[in-house]
Amino acid sequence: MEINHDYRVKLFDELGFERKQCTECNQWFWTLDKDRTTCGDSPCDEYSFIGSPITSKKYTYNEMVKEFTNFFAEKGHSPVKRSPVVAKRWRDDILLTIASIAVFQPWVTSGLVKPVKNPLVIAQPCIRLNDIDNVGRTGRHLTCFTMGAHHAFNSKDEYKYWTDKTVEYCFELMKRLGIDEKTVTFIESWWEGGGNAGPCYEVITHGVELATLVFMQYKKVGNDYEEIPLKIVDTGYGIERFAWASQGTPTVYESLFSEVIEKLKKDAGIPEVDEKIMAESATLAGLMDIENVGDLRVLRQKVAEKIGMDVDELDKLISPLEYIYAIADHTRCLSFMFGDGIVPSNVKEGYLARLVLRKTLRYMEKIGISMSIKDIIAMQLENMKEIYPELSEMKEYIMDVLDSEEKKYIQTVNRGRGIVERMAVSKSEITLDDLIELYDSNGIPPEIVKDVVDEINKKGKKTIAITVPDNFYTIVAERHEEEKPEEVVSTKKELPELEVSETELLFFKHPTQVEFEAKVLKTVEKYVLLDKTLFYAEGGGQKYDIGQLNGIEVSDVQKKNGIVFHKVSDISKFKEGDTVKGTLNWENRLKLMRNHTATHVINAAATRVLGKHIWQTGSNVDTEKGRLDITHYERISREQVKEIERIANEIVLSKMPVNSTFMDRNDSEQKYGFTIYQGGVVPGDTLRIIEIEGTDVEACGGTHCSNTSEVGYIKVLKTERIQDGVERLEYSTGMGSVSEIAVLEDILIDSAEILGIPNDQLPKTVKRFFEEWKEQKKTIEELQKKVGELVKYELADKFEKHGDYEVLVEQVSGTPNELMSIADNLAIGNKLIVLMNENDYLLCKRGENVELSMKELIRNIGKGGGKDNLAQGKYSETKEQITEKISQILNK
């Protein structure tokens, strides 16, 4: 469709705004300044607010949040509480909250759900990591920023306001803050994002963009656009930029983090840098419109020329301060990430949090900050307490996770040096892909890789090329920022697409009913489709019900597009239009109800024991056992498991009612928060809420007991770490728990009988046996070492010269451990050892001066694998044949 948007609004006509075309960038804009020839934005105009605040008073960040919110509240907008910075709490297409409108996507913007208020105002903290490498360097970039926004959702039935009022509100806010109205320009522009589009204004003053006013009214379809039912006012005001412009500080960082910056400077012993230098750098950064760090070296050169200083001297002077700026920004970002419950891991939002944290720790090391990161974040929490008290409520978790992650970081760095050294043996260049692989798979920062490679190059034995891009962390973050739907590999046959009415689910209204009558709508393959059913279809982690239809077994129940498919053993017994009698296997259903209710109970108990940060990432409810996957930053201890189990059974014994109600989506979120989505994102404007009174509330479509007392005894059977940052708890209920305890008891009794001791003596006896075994093992290892030393002398004369190396290929009697001990004694310098025993075991080990990979060698002379310095496997050829192959390899 052809779009011709008229950017003229009522305010422009009333006040005499003129439409002009910028002489620098050719963009069209509106201004009250008749003499203006440029649009006002950088790089067409430089920052003119640095050292010269543009508002009638200086505002702190907290004051600006309040001023913005109060202004729009006075204009009839209802203030709405911020959402978490973890967008995954309510949507499954992005990980982090990147804009205020993301809070209302996809449910409100699609028209499926009404907005909680209309119009509304929100000050939403957002996180974008696509500029993380620019933070600290350009003077304006932030990873975490607050998007102030007023939104209006206009429909056919409810119209609020559109372009005229939006521009009027913006201009009035500028005047209220004391900004000279002649300096304000409205640039005509176009916005696209998330599949939507619309015209917009970029609102500029003194060289800086303070707001964007978007009028979302189209859907992008290929290369064309379609109108959408809602006309959405989507504005974004940069709260931090307003505060910066009101203070006129050299960079945005001083306006936000002055206390933190001063303490970090003092701690690191960084001398004061002339404010003019930082102001010049920020101003030139604006003029260059820096959006990638490839331009930063050019920026540094321009600043050096402008102030008459050598570029290397300038770099040495301001780099430490830029690191401090970045640390200040990153620690605020981490405060929101961890405060909103992100658990560091190697995937998804946990990966991004760990990336920011490790980058911060690396910068702290680089400039020698002795303060702990916990102390810095504690300062940030205190400074934000007035506006975000909920972050301070998570302080204990935040401090614990920082402790845990800092230890992991140190271990990673220590281990990483060896990994890089081994990689470097067979490399002439460490590429960007290598750097990303080392970071993603092993957590090794690129700076550590470069340090190790530089050390190798200094030794002069070989030269390895390496270049670490200035925007490395941006590249890595962008690969992980967008949520990609997990590929689910189904073992079930794909259900057909059918045009029949959705199945009425009777178990919502009649959870204890066992029998029902229904009409057959259709039969397809082995499936019967009914107009109504009591059978629960597999979903939400819960297994399907089983039972009978007219006495014919129902062995599987699935759902697609609201239609329930009942798999029967004899489809010929059913015809369209028949009335059938359905009967549930109640014993099977009861087990599922108990285990599903137990999932909610254990999740609540785990939250009390481990903290509010835990989040359900998955569950599986079967008849015999259930399992619950939750985020947590360390292994759950034995004591914690016992406490979770104790609290869970306390909830059971407390006979808490389990209530099921259907609620409006907005009402549910407002009343209970986003924790209702623990079981996953639920579509629709109406949610089924399961509430265990005073214990747990979730949006859930499964079957549950009506009272916790019906669950029976809950036994946590085991925990395991299924991935970094995710713990799995496996449990049973009722008679299932009794059976599991009986199995454990049998193991205990059988073990005691084997040892001929009473049950209560088992731990003590096993401990004694283990200590004795360790002593014997130590003795055996010492004997093996001595044997190895003796054999060393026997084999010393059997080395043969092949190229630059001395090679030993020998068949030796002994266990793999004994052969390893012999090889350890012989593999030094330029010696290459190949040992075989009578059981076809093959061992290859090299001295430190041998460059040939043992992993590659063993693949050529046998079968096996290992590392570059040591490989093990099997052989099938004779000693002579193996020797000949090695000779050919070494004498190429």
Swiss-Prot record:
Organism field: Methanococcus maripaludis (strain C5 / ATCC BAA-1333)
InterPro entries: aa-tRNA-synth_II/BPL/LPL (IPR045864), Ala-tRNA-lgiase_IIc (IPR002318), Ala-tRNA-ligase_IIc_anticod-bd (IPR018162), Ala-tRNA-synth_IIc_core (IPR018165), Ala-tRNA-synth_IIc_N (IPR018164), Ala-tRNA_lgiase_arc (IPR022429), Ala-tRNA_ligase (IPR050058), Thr/Ala-tRNA-synth_IIc_edit (IPR018163)
UniProt key word Isomerase: no
Top-level class of the enzyme under EC nomenclature: ligase
Cofactor (UniProt): Zn(2+)
UniProt comment concerning the protein's domains: Consists of three domains; the N-terminal catalytic domain, the editing domain and the C-terminal C-Ala domain. The editing domain removes incorrectly charged amino acids, while the C-Ala domain, along with tRNA(Ala), serves as a bridge to cooperatively bring together the editing and aminoacylation centers thus stimulating deacylation of misacylated tRNAs.
GO BP, one annotated term: alanyl-tRNA aminoacylation
Protein localization: Cytoplasm
Any matching Pfam family: tRNA-synt_2c
Any GO MF annotation of the entry: ATP binding
Top-level lineage group: Archaea
Family under the similarity heading: Belongs to the class-II aminoacyl-tRNA synthetase family.
Encoding gene per record: alaS
Protein name (record): Alanine--tRNA ligase
Residues binding Zn(2+), per UniProt: H596, H600, C700, H704
